[in-house]
Every structure is written in C-alpha cells, then in structure tokens.
C-alpha cells in the first residue's frame, strides 16, 4: 500500500507541476486588455466542409454561412461528400455549395477528405483566388457575424486563427455537457489568455482558419492523424507560426452525447 501511495503522490505532483500555470491564466483576462484591431480589409475566403452522411444537418450550416454579415460574394462554400451513402451531396448543392464527391475506403478520415478537396479546388481555380480557408464540421452553425469577426483577426496579421467553439446540445446529457464545458474552458481559459499574452493558441477540431500562404508552406493539407487538429497545431508552432484566437467568432457544435459515439 505504501508503494501505491507513493506512486499516487508522485503522479499528483507531476500533474500539479504540468497544470499549475493554468491557474495564472484565470487572472490574465482581468489584467491584460486585448489589443485594438488594425483596420479590417476585405478578403476572399473558401469554406471547407468535410461531410459523411450528414444530410440531416449540412443544410443548416450552409444556411448560416449564407446569412453572414460579411459580403457573400467573397465567400465560397465547398463540401466534400466523403464516402456518403445518403443525400448529403444533393442537399449541399441545393443550399448553394460547390460539392465534390469522394469514394475511398482505403484512406479514411477528415484529413484525407480535406486534402482531396483542396486538390480539387486547385484544379477548379488555378488562379488561386482565395486568401484563406475556413474549416467546419457539417453539424456546426455559425453566428451571423462569424466570418466578419474572423476577418478582423486575419487583418491583424494572423495566418492561422481558431475561434470560440460553443455547444448547441449542452443539455442533452452529462456527456454532451462535459464536452461543452471542456471546449468552453479551452476557448475562454486557455486560448483567450494565450492570445492576451501574445503566445500561440491551439486549433481544436473545427472552426479555424488558415491562409493560402500557410497552405503553400505546408505543401498542402498533409495532416492525416485521428487528431489532425493537434497535428496541425504542432506543425505551425514548430515552424514558428503563431496561432491567433478570435473570441468574438462563435460557432455552435453538436457535441458527442453517447459513449458509443466517443
């Protein structure tokens, strides 16, 4: 028993050392005020959505993009219907998206789908008209000023930006509530203080932007792990790119609510 207690004590100390700095983060927003934005310039954005059998929700996301306060002529929505067996592609087209369909059971995952979609965009638009790309999951819904707010932070000079990931099903059960609280903590108590301190933030799954310049420097979208968001974050930090955070750009995500889905 003494050995087990000692192991538990050592683990507790290690976790305390690793996470103690986050207690300081709680104070940062009250001590350091956000820097004023630079004058915003208009940029052209491509929205990337990877969807597999998302016919029930894909239309809601595209509609929320079409309702943005940002000029619609500067936003093009692309959907890759990835190994779909339902009407995802048809519904996305009906709501105004440019849709490509992908069928590949050997290379499975969001990273492969995004890589496929970006290659198709290059073929369709060889002149490369887009300044930056935004990535969303098919079950997201955006606040009406989401793109406008992201554009303001992009105009500040950030080449990679993450946003505030909120929940649209917080009250379903304890699992969805737990995920919602985790992502609230990640946005408000990790990325926000890091942004105030001038350090790099972290991309988390959905609701992020990267510039054409970053895509070129990465040699395309070559992030294929199950946690491709973490892989992308680490690649940017290792290569000296600072990831920004836009607290005013809010999206609502349908979070997992069963242990089987996890």
Regions found by a protein language model. Give the residues of each.
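N-terminal membrane-anchoring/stem segments of glycan-assembly enzymes
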Residues: 1-41, 92
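Acidic helix N-cap motif at the loop->helix transition within catalytic regions
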Residues: 57-59, 86-93, 145
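Long helical/loop segments within the catalytic core of UDP-sugar-dependent glycosyltransferases
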Residues: 103-126, 130, 144-226
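Short beta-strand-to-loop acidic/aromatic patch adjacent to the donor-nucleotide binding site
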Residues: 127-139
């Amino acid at each position: 028993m003494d050995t087990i207690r000692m192991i538990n004590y050592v683990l507790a100390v290690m976790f305390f050392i690793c996470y103690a700095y986050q207690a300081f983060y709680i104070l940062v927003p009250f001590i350091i005020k956000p820097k004023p934005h630079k004058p915003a310039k208009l940029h052209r954005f491509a929205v990337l959505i990877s969807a597999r059998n998302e016919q029930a929700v894909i239309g809601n996301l595209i509609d929320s993009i079409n309702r943005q306060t940002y000029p619609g002529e500067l936003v093009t929505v692309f959907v890759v219907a990835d190994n779909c067996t339902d009407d995802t592609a048809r519904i996305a087209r009906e709501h105004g998206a440019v849709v490509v369909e992908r069928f590949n059971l050997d290379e499975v995952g969001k990273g492969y789908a995004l890589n496929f979609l970006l290659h198709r965009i290059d073929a369709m638009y060889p002149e490369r008209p887009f300044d930056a790309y935004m990535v969303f999951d098919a079950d997201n819904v955006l606040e009406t000023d989401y793109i406008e707010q992201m554009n303001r932070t992009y105009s500040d000079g950030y080449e990679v930006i993450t946003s505030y990931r909120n929940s649209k099903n917080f009250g379903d059960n304890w699992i969805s509530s737990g995920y919602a609280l985790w992502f609230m903590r990640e946005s408000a108590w990790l990325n926000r203080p890091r942004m105030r301190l001038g350090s790099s933030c972290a991309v988390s799954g959905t609701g992020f932007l990267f510039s054409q310049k970053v895509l070129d420097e990465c040699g395309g979208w070559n992030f294929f792990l199950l946690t491709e968001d973490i892989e992308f974050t680490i690649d940017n930090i290792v290569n000296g790119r600072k990831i920004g955070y836009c607290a005013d750009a809010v999206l609502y995500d349908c979070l997992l609510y069963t242990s089987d889905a996890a």
